[in-house]
């Protein structure tokens, strides 16, 4: 595990890294690290953090569900969520006023699931965390930039291996040595149930090497001929869309004209998924007659 962390850190530029089973596990472990600060007596008590500084301050617009509520991962690590601001707007003074003696960490979520306007910046979070001598955790699960979040000054940055990097099921926490050491201490507590297998460690490092060399990047230009071919089918109109959070991830967006095609978007998506070669689409906008194809998956 230590050696894998060293290899991962070569790609992130961080002082150290800790590998785990997935990004959700990484959030729980990072929260537990912030609360226990690596103290073994406290580690064995997690997720029971009664009597400890256990509050995790985050923006209300960042309180998302990625298949499970992010609050579930926070609670698994012993954290108690403190929301800041309203769903669509937050101010720095609100973040600062939420910090008390019970605060364990700040959490910043970078995700297409989050509200994208009216939120505080990562710079605001870094500055407030440093003033109050608190660790800053960044959930960058699906982010493709391995360097920016570490370079921002965050203490623990959580990534998924399987999302942007096309690794086997895996995740990792990368950041400052003090806090990664506290994450590693959780192996004798909650992280024991979240450990990663040796095969997936190898797969993660291999995937990061490929990603570093640019072998997994699919450009908008490469997708355009595919979109054009799809648009030639009567009742389908395809174009290229960029990821909602502004990442350099491009997908084919397909609009279904149910009257012309003879079936609606739900039926098209089901046929793709249930075919001899299963094709899984992004289904978030099926109710609008739209779905997307992500070439990475």
What do these predicted regions represent?
Residues 1, 11-212, 227-234, 239, ...:
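Conserved PLP-enzyme active-site core in the AAT-like
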Residues 1-7, 101, 246, 282-283:
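N-terminal glycine-rich anion-binding loops that anchor highly charged ligand groups
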Residues 4, 217-230:
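N-terminal, charge-rich interaction modules
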Residues 4-6, 158-160, 269-270:
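Intrinsically disordered, low-complexity segments enriched in polar/charged residues with Gly/Pro
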Residues 209-214, 294-296:
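Glycine-rich phosphate/diphosphate-binding loops and the adjacent beta-loop-alpha structural elements
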Residues 231-297:
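Conserved C-terminal alpha-helix-loop-beta "cap" of PLP-dependent enzymes
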């Amino acid at each position: 595990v230590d050696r894998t962390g060293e290899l991962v850190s070569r790609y992130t530029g961080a002082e150290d890294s800790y590998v785990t089973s997935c990004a959700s596990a990484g959030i729980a472990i990072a929260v537990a690290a912030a609360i226990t600060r690596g103290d073994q007596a406290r580690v064995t008590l997690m997720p029971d953090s009664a009597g400890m500084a256990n509050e995790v301050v985050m923006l209300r617009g960042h309180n998302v569900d990625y298949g499970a509520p992010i609050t579930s991962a926070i609670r698994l690590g012993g954290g108690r969520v403190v929301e800041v601001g309203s769903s669509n707007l937050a101010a720095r003074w609100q973040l600062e006023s939420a910090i008390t003696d019970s605060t364990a960490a700040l959490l910043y979520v970078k995700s297409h699931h989050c509200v994208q306007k009216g939120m505080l910046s990562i710079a605001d979070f870094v500055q407030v965390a440093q003033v109050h001598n608190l660790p800053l955790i960044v959930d960058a699960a699906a982010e493709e930039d391995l360097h920016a979040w570490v370079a921002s000054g965050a203490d623990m940055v959580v990534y998924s291996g399987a999302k942007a990097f096309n690794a086997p099921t895996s995740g990792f926490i990368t950041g400052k040595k003090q806090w990664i050491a506290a994450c590693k201490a959780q192996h004798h507590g909650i992280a024991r149930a979240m450990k990663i297998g040796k095969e997936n460690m190898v797969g993660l490092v291999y995937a990061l090497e490929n990603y570093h060399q640019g072998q997994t990047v699919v450009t908008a230009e490469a997708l355009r001929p595919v979109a054009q071919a799809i648009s030639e089918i009567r009742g389908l109109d395809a174009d290229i869309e960029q990821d909602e959070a502004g990442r350099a991830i491009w997908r084919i967006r397909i609009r279904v004209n149910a009257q012309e095609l003879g079936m609606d978007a739900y039926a098209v998506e089901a046929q793709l998924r249930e075919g001899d070669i299963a094709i899984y689409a992004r289904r978030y906008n099926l109710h609008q007659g739209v779905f997307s194809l992500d070439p990475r998956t």
